[in-house]
């Protein structure tokens, strides 16, 4: 990793696919363009996403997860033991290809190495982050038709993910984020769910980040310091920063990734609003352990709005950096 400034800015993972990529995917499904043409479109989209992140001033970018349709489906398609029967309705007219576990979970081959290697080759920084969905969330959002209990399934999946993460490190990944938005869904699962995440990152030599977003933070707060990761990032903006008090109460002692951008609202935060929110966070945590990010992935927004939100996030962060510099902090 290269040296980062005080209050590094990053994204959670996903970013809106360019319209022309969505059209290329449609044409490929219709058999009108080749696999090679689709891969070229994916590669071009990664370059476009990284350009947006660069122009916005993001310190730690991602490839936007543009090759992935969904955060669970992508991995279930590539790990032995899963099967898809068809889409299920999530709400209204929204459908999701929910996977089912029908046999023992086994790691087959690298899933993310090729996409990381390409993103690394075109990235403007070696502080490139790669994301992977965690074992608990994949299981929670799947059907179990094989294992006698959920815990055994999660731990088998954690072992498979551990192999993938180690392959990413071997390919040069320095910052790896495990996405566990479902970890705090069920209070009774949290303690062993944390153990499963630790199994997934066992023996990994990289900067490890975990993402937690919407849900009941009070379920997971007592266990956060047990996670074998360097940083945990949270959705805060949507909760008006109320979880800060909870984390402080439980003595949260890791790096904190603070969500300051509401990804479900098309309103674009101003840079001064972001700066005020960061000042609020600094009442609870020191700047040396604070990173700045959106609440969650940006993929559901338009590309224009997502980009403008990132610009506000970065500009607001710069305002606070300058204030800290005047107080004697080293910010570069």
From Swiss-Prot:
Gene3D superfamilies xrefs: 3.20.20.210
Cofactor binding note from Swiss-Prot or TrEMBL: Binds 1 zinc ion per subunit.
Enzyme type, top EC level: transferase
Record's keyword annotation contains Zinc: yes
A GO molecular function held by the record: zinc ion binding
Record pathway: Amino-acid biosynthesis; L-methionine biosynthesis via de novo pathway
Gene Ontology terms describing biological process: methionine biosynthetic process; methylation
InterPro entries: Met_Synth_C/arc, MetE_arc, UROD/MetE-like_sf
Keywords, in A-Z order: Amino-acid biosynthesis, Metal-binding, Methionine biosynthesis, Methyltransferase, Transferase, Zinc
Positions bound to Zn(2+): 211, 213, 296
UniProt cofactor(s): Zn(2+)
Enzyme Commission code: 2.1.1.-
PANTHER family documented for this protein: 5-METHYLTETRAHYDROPTEROYLTRIGLUTAMATE--HOMOCYSTEINE METHYLTRANSFERASE
Record-linked HAMAP family: MetE
NCBIfam families (UniProt xref): PRK04326.1
Protein purpose: Catalyzes the transfer of a methyl group to L-homocysteine resulting in methionine formation. The physiological methyl donor is unknown.
Family statement drawn from the similarity comment of this UniProt entry: Belongs to the archaeal MetE family.
Protein name stated in the entry: Methionine synthase
Organism: Saccharolobus islandicus (strain Y.G.57.14 / Yellowstone #1)
